[in-house]
Swiss-Prot record:
Lineage of source species: Eukaryota, Viridiplantae, Streptophyta, Embryophyta, Tracheophyta
GO molecular function ontology, one term from the record: oxidoreductase activity, acting on paired donors, with incorporation or reduction of molecular oxygen
Gene: CYP71D182
Record CDD domains: CYP71-like (cd11072)
Application in biotechnology: The monoterpenic phenol thymol is widely used as a fragrance and a flavoring ingredient in food and cosmetic industries. Its derivatives have also several biological and pharmacological properties such as antimicrobial, antioxidant, anticarcinogenesis, anti-inflammatory and antispasmodic activities. Medical applications include the treatment of disorders affecting the respiratory, nervous, and cardiovascular systems. It may also act as a growth enhancer and immunomodulator.
Gene Ontology BP annotations: terpenoid biosynthetic process
InterPro entries from the UniProt entry: CYP450_71D, Cyt_P450, Cyt_P450_CS, Cyt_P450_E_grp-I, Cyt_P450_sf
Pfam families noted in UniProt: p450
Name assigned to this protein: Cytochrome P450 71D182
Binding site for heme: 435
Enzyme Commission (EC) number: 1.14.14.-
UniProt pathway annotation: Secondary metabolite biosynthesis; terpenoid biosynthesis
Length: 496
């Protein structure tokens, strides 16, 4: 009996303390914060984010409370931005105040303590590693020079689909493999051995790192941190990834050169690691974090966008016919197809824009407000977590007619770019933290898609109609298809 009473006293004391802390934090907030739903003690609005994808649920909140709304996630005061003006102020007008990233348990473990590019704090380390990657790998000039790799790998993929003519094939799996090989050869000078193992490690770790953890929203609780069992699973996954990457880097250091005959980006990072004049030391974890970025962002996002574009075209046969007619007329008789040729394909590029609008690679862009700021008239306190709902902005009827309909023709009337200037369409972000691999990613989307539409007439498996195509998104940091896309390739005969 005494033990039971003691536990009751402890629990009541802890809850009372947490409630008092909750009220104390609320009292410290400025008066002019963005509006938000009524919240519960302790958990805030966590109960409103159950049973769906975060970008969908947060859209419901901003539709009711306005495009700039606050959500209390446990101890964490957060603000959702779901309008072009709010995104423009945060990513352009006040960019330095919002250029930082917040991290959680999953990203801290799998992205090597934020020594990578994606989750790095906005500091000299980030500036240095970004500059190296852009100058050595991701500049438009460099991206064009890798054209022969895209052509080589697409030729292999086309032969594979030709050998499966008339049979259902897992297009998702084959495109993922092809994009992964392109990225590997470009970044590391050769295809990675045991590529399927690395892809599986990255996909599984992304799934684990994207999960919800109570310890993330109650960072002051040592007990929740101790009981966060997924943290221990993540560390075991990190150990498996470390073992793979350590072996890969050891082989890389002893090889004479890659297929380019000179330095690749890993060689450059190692050279700068040994250079005493390098401003910020480059660690082995930093190099591994970069490799993880390449495969988690560079591979998954490009492949996912190709698959979303194909999925939408299969649902709208008239759009597919228009895209194929343009591709086949423009590329007729051309043996080498890359960025220069694809640049002429106005409608195909609109198809890609529309796929990115409806299915952005990163549905929500995380930022951290490091200094008290004002966005659309509301006060955003320092250290507020910012979630820019790119998915919601891309489907807002204020900016898009029939926003949920796939319609590439809409860009004939209102052209919009996807490089961060038009805030109605920001799949790669904008400002200082815009995706550094933007041009590389677009090349790895547009060139393969053009080739697939040129060489094949795509059919659905027997008994399946366009209405049966599963368009469900997977939960996670990126927004790929939940289930694989299965299609039947039919070789296109230009003379038929």
């Amino acid at each position: 009996m005494d033990i039971s009473i003691s536990w009751v006293v402890i629990i009541v004391s802890v809850l009372s303390y947490l409630i008092l802390m909750d009220k104390w934090r609320a009292a410290k907030l400025p008066k002019n914060i963005p509006p938000g739903p009524p919240k519960l003690p302790l958990i805030g609005h966590l109960h409103l984010l159950r049973g769906g994808l975060p970008q969908h649920l947060l859209r419901g909140i901003t539709q009711k409370y306005g495009p700039v709304a606050h959500v209390q996630l446990g101890e964490l005061f957060s603000v959702v931005l779901s309008s072009t003006e709010a995104a423009r102020q945060a990513m352009k007008v006040l960019d330095p105040n919002f250029a930082d990233r917040f991290v959680n348990i999953g990203s801290r473990i799998m992205w090597y303590d934020s020594e990578d590019i994606i989750f790095s704090r906005y500091n000299d380390h980030w500036r240095q590693i970004r500059k190296i990657c852009v100058s050595e790998l991701l500049s438009p000039k460099n991206v064009r020079s890798f054209g022969y790799i895209r052509q080589d790998e697409m030729a292999r993929l086309i032969r594979l689909f030709e050998s499966s003519e008339g049979k259902p094939v897992n297009v998702s799996e084959e495109i993922s493999k092809t994009v992964c090989t392109i990225v590997s050869r470009v970044a590391f000078g050769s295809a990675v051995k045991d590529q399927s193992l690395l892809m599986n490690l990255v996909k599984e770790s992304l799934r684990m790192a994207s999960g919800f953890e109570l310890a993330d929203v109650f960072p002051s609780s040592w007990l929740l941190n101790l009981l966060c069992f997924n943290k221990y699973r993540l560390w075991r996954m990190r150990a498996r990834l470390d073992k793979f990457l350590d072996g890969f880097l050891a082989e890389h250091r002893v090889k004479k050169s890659g297929e380019f005959g000179g330095e690749d980006i890993i060689d450059v990072l190692y050279r700068m690691q040994e250079d005493s004049e390098t401003k910020v030391p480059i660690t082995n974890n930093g190099i591994k974090g970069f490799i993880y970025d390449v495969f988690s962002a560079g591979t998954d996002t490009s492949g996912a966008t190709i698959l979303w574009a194909l999925s939408e075209l299969m649902r709208y046969p008239e759009k597919m016919a228009k895209a194929q007619a343009e591709v086949r007329e423009t590329l007729k008789g051309k043996t080498n197809v890359d960025m220069a040729e694809v640049h002429e394909l106005k409608y195909l590029r609109s198809v890609v824009k529309e796929a990115l609008r409806l299915h952005p690679p990163f549905p929500m862009i995380p930022r951290l407000c490091v200094q008290e700021s004002e966005v659309t008239g509301y006060t955003i306190p320092a250290n507020t977590r910012i979630l820019i709902n790119v998915w919601s902005i891309g489907r807002d009827p204020l900016y898009w007619e029939d926003p949920d309909t796939f319609n590439p023709d809409r860009y004939d009337e209102v052209p919009r770019d996807i490089i961060g200037n038009d805030f109605e369409l920001i799949p790669f972000g904008s400002g200082r933290r815009i995706c550094p691999g933007l041009h590389f990613g677009l090349a790895n989307i547009e060139v393969p898609l053009a080739q697939l539409l040129y060489h094949f007439d795509w059919k659905l498996p027997p008994g399946m109609t366009a209405a049966d195509i599963d368009m469900t998104e997977k939960t996670g940091l990126s927004g790929p298809r939940k289930n694989p896309l299965i299609l039947v390739p039919i070789i296109h005969n230009p003379t038929s």
